[in-house]
Amino acid sequence: MTRIKRGSIARARRTKIRFFASKFRGSHSRLTRSIIQQGIRAFVSSQRDRDKKKRDFRRLWITRLNAAIRAIGVGYSYSASIHNLYKSQLILNRKILTQIAILNRNCLYMISNEILKSGV
């Protein structure tokens, strides 16, 4: 039985992963085993940080919204306002509320008055 060396197939596979790792430093861009390991690590880090970015933005929106609610002097906190918002069945998420608070403070004041007027 003759020996098959897989030259072109293996080279194509390594070239493909080497192209991905061409921006890495040192042996992480030259050695195949290191390239594979660093590629896996890069994908894991990117997935983790995408999830972390979602959490960070949510924290930012909550902080901004809390500051805006306390600044307009409606008289209650962020948590109470969100609770009353859900009870009055207004469908506004934190991102939209924060944009309203930044761009048009009067509109946020009117929304909070509507929540208080609805008697929840």
From Swiss-Prot:
One Pfam family from the UniProt entry?
Answer: Ribosomal_L20
Asked if Methyltransferase is a keyword of the record, the answer is: no
* Cellular component, GO annotation: plastid; ribonucleoprotein complex; ribosome
Q: Output the PROSITE patterns linked to this UniProt entry.
A: RIBOSOMAL_L20 (PS00937)
Q: Which InterPro entries match?
A: Ribosomal_bL20 (IPR005813), RIBOSOMAL_L20_CS (IPR049946), Ribosomal_protein_bL20_C (IPR035566)
Main localization of the protein?
Answer: plastid
- Entry's transmembrane regions: none
Per its record, what are the GO molecular function terms? Answer: rRNA binding; structural constituent of ribosome
GO terms classed as biological process? translation
Locations listed in the record: Plastid
Keyword Repeat appears in the UniProt entry: no
Keywords, alphabetical: Plastid, Ribonucleoprotein, Ribosomal protein, RNA-binding, rRNA-binding
Q: What does this protein do?
A: Binds directly to 23S ribosomal RNA and is necessary for the in vitro assembly process of the 50S ribosomal subunit. It is not involved in the protein synthesizing functions of that subunit.
Q: Which PANTHER family match?
A: 39S RIBOSOMAL PROTEIN L20 (PTHR10986)
Family stated for the protein in its record: Belongs to the bacterial ribosomal protein bL20 family.
What's the protein called, per UniProt? Large ribosomal subunit protein bL20c
Highest lineage ranks of the organism? Eukaryota, Viridiplantae, Streptophyta, Embryophyta, Tracheophyta
> What is the gene name?
rpl20
